[in-house]
Amino acid sequence: MERERNLNNLRYSSSKFLQQAIRVNHAGEYGAICIYSGQKFILKKSSIIKEIIEMEEQEKKHFHYFNEKIKEQKVRPTVLLPVWRVLGVSLGVATAIMGRKTAMACTAAVEEVIGEHYKEQVLHLEDGELRETISKFRDEELEHRDIAIEHNAEGAFGYNILSSFIKTGCKAAIYLSKLI
């Protein structure tokens, strides 16, 4: 009886983790698209617009993947998507208004947190298609971070403070999207 209860608890725990992972990844990719959308609006004539568009296109592919997983696994999306839209576009616009370096500092901070978040998920997921895909997406997110650093993200005024602020916001969004 005890063993059966433990097995049921493990199944519930695994199922709950899977649902939270899909929900939060769906929300995160949506938020990233919104950030890039805000940056594109301001930096449309900038020398880094090509990179921003390419990174946004990858985020759209990630989002579509998790959107399919939401449907396939019957996972409830976070109710916070409208909030993430407003905050994401606003963050993209605000950092882009402060200049290319600040926009790239935003990208570097966000992608670093997402890379760590995906790494943690990969460690907890069983082998399979979802784990492989999240691992691939993690590599792509870290490429975005590296592109941002190559474009002098760390040269942004107040980089350390800005980066810490954005990383904290991302971690809060991850936490809330898992639950709500």
Predicted regions and their residues:
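Non-heme di-metal
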Residues: 1-180
